[in-house]
Amino acid sequence: MKSRYRLLLIGALLALSFRMLACSGQDFGVLQPEDLCKCLPIEPDIADYRHAAKHMPIPSNMPPVEIMVTDILAWPQDPLPLPIDQPRTGRELQVFHLANAFLQETSVNSADCDVHMEISQTADKNAPRVIIETPVDSEFCSARQQIQAQLKQHNFRLDSQHGGELPAALPLQVLGMAFEDFDHSRGSAQVATIWELHPATVNILP
């Protein structure tokens, strides 16, 4: 039991260290290509919290449950981090769809190459937010390119060197699976839950 807890602690600390560096704009001395499908993760899988649970395709044969951002914000959170190798259970096995949400921030995580996004129920910049992520995995290549192209239409550049807070929130739709992260520095001050949609794909509306 003690060794399992020690492994969890070490993994969480490693993940936290990489996330803090990534969020502070560190590129680890590597210039990543602009093509999001060619981004190469620098963070080792072992340092990624619950890596196997996050990196999976969204089931295409599972009808999505319609929810809102406010529903995710209300989901109960575990008081202690789940084990670093915890498989998906319960709510995490479901697919969810958000027909109406707003994109507030987006960037490419310099450690694992996932596209990080913060969404809210309203366009208000102070509204509570939820993190959603589109993974680096090859099956999400077209989804990542779509995000990049749609943001470009709004004069916002997204690649491994560019991103951040949007000048104004953009309406979007989201399809993804619930994922319970752990409490660490992982976004803006408006992020109000450790629950995410990860993996997730988005469609930014005109």
Residue ranges and their predicted role:
Residues M1-L9:
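Bacterial N-terminal signal peptides that target proteins for export
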Residues I10-R19:
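Bacterial N-terminal signal peptides
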Residues C23-P206:
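OB-fold and OB-like single-stranded nucleic-acid-recognition modules
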